[in-house]
Amino acid sequence: PNHTVEQILSQPLKLYFNLSGDELKKNIIDLLKKVRLGEFYMSRYPRQLSGGEKQRVAVARAFAAKPDIILCDEVTSALDVSVQAAVLNLLQQLKEDLGTTYVFVSHDLAVVRAISDRVAVLYQGRLCEIGPSQNVYKFPSHPYTEVLLGAVLEPDPDIKPKLVAEDIVEEKPPEKGCSFQGRCPRKIGDICNSEVPPWQIGENGNAIRCHINIEELASLQQ
């Protein structure tokens, strides 16, 4: 908080590329331009920036090292909807311009759908389903993914989700079996409690861990 934007952006440039002087300043200005901030932001402190501007500076700092992969952990949380959209558009544009891969972590399903090419769904820290983004959203295969998407508010409040999880609070994942066993509405028996589900790949390209055959799950969801 006691560093200016110039000082914040100069650190990775010095560390990774040993830049200094005019060359350092030029690279800082270029980074600010990439995230659509003017040169005059160099002298500003974080306390003088809005939430969206702070996120843009954070994005610029991440790109300063010219990484192949960037971990984006809840980058749009605590931002209002319009600022979220601006940050997502910026990240999308930078991805197209620079060819960078994002590992995008978020609890916001709409944000994940907007930014991702592939989606990995986790429950209690364990993978449940992986697949192309559009397939996971349109044709969820794992019971937890189905419950998760069914919990999203619909424009029509009379529309009820097809599948609802058991209302049980789990403080930690089970030691054995499926991580979703305590809340799964499609639980089939003791095997769910005792054995880790195998991976299965469906015709839609989604991979899931479940004891129920993936094609049988698809028929249950119709």
PLM-predicted stretches and their roles:
Residues 1-14:
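Q-loop/switch helix immediately C-terminal to the Walker
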Residues 22-40, 149:
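Conserved ABC ATPase "signature" region
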Residues 45-49, 53:
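Conserved ABC ATPase signature
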Residues 59, 71, 87:
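Hydrophobic anchor residue at the start of the ABC signature
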Residues 64-68:
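A short, proline-enriched helix->beta-strand linker immediately N-terminal to the Walker B motif
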Residues 75, 79, 83-158:
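P-loop NTP-binding/switch modules centered on Walker-like glycine-rich loops
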Residues 132-222:
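Short catalytic/signature loops enriched in Gly
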